[in-house]
A protein has these predicted regions:
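Glycine-rich phosphate-binding loops of nucleotide-dependent enzymes
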Residues: 2-236
Length: 236
């Protein structure tokens, strides 16, 4: 059974339909990318999975449980970590306190120090800035902090929305290197990313979303070599 199974979800904003029968799945150990142009429905898909939006029809099943109507705080407790577009940090709190905000749903408080150490191992720059206000960090450091905060919940699935947006190429490389490391340590990842080449390069599988509908799916390598994908998203 897939860890996450999204089946035929339809989502509306008022009278505007944002998602049209979207279906996708994620298995244990996978990185799955969701690519598409701006306004295609990628962020809405993540928000619907995490309980920030709700589908009018269709189902979202996570770890064997139907979470279609679950509020966001329940999906966090179920094991879904979501690092949203725009990072959504607490700018007047220090780095360490932002990380601690990711632990609010945890019952195993004893494991928190080791998980903070793990985040600092993944992102040494955060350790150097542990007492610095989040609002004074660079864009790349803020993205590291957003990912680290999501990891502090010990998610069974990590969802990332545009992790490389606005970052310099060298920081983009760092973020993607760490994502593959997180995945290699056992955490599945659902990745929405405007840099389609990088996303498909690290993804085991991927979906292409256009105007709210899935129009193509395959392995990352298959979509990298697809003429349609190359023309529309890879600038070839």
């Amino acid at each position: 059974m897939a860890l996450l199974e999204v089946s035929g979800i339809n989502v509306f904003y008022g009278r505007v339909q944002a998602l049209r029968g979207v279906s996708l799945s994620i298995n244990a150990g996978e990185i799955v990318a969701l690519i598409g142009s701006n306004g295609a429905g990628k962020t809405t898909t993540l928000r619907t999975i995490s309980g920030l939006n709700h589908a009018t029809t269709g189902r979202v099943v996570f770890d064997g449980r139907d979470i279609s109507a679950a509020p966001a705080h329940d999906t966090v407790r179920a094991g879904i970590g979501h690092a949203p577009e725009g990072r959504r940090l607490f700018p007047r709190m220090i780095v360490l306190d932002n990380l601690m905000m990711g632990t609010y749903s945890r019952k195993d408080r004893q494991g928190i120090p080791s998980d903070i150490a793990r985040v600092y191992e993944l992102f040494p720059r955060l350790k150097e800035r542990t007492k610095q206000l989040a609002g004074t960090l660079s864009g790349g450091e803020q993205q590291m902090l957003a990912i680290g905060r999501a990891l502090m919940a010990r998610p069974k699935l990590l969802m990332l929305d545009e992790p490389s947006l606005g970052l310099a190429p060298i920081l983009c490389e760092t973020i993607f290197r760490v994502l593959t490391e997180i995945n290699a340590q056992g955490t599945p990842i659902l990745l929405v990313e405007q840099n389609a080449t990088k996303a498909l390069d690290v993804a085991h599988r991927a979906y292409v979303l256009e105007t709210g509908s899935i129009v193509q799916t395959g392995t990352g390598k298959e979509l990298l070599s697809s003429p349609d994908v190359q023309r529309a998203y890879l600038g070839m």
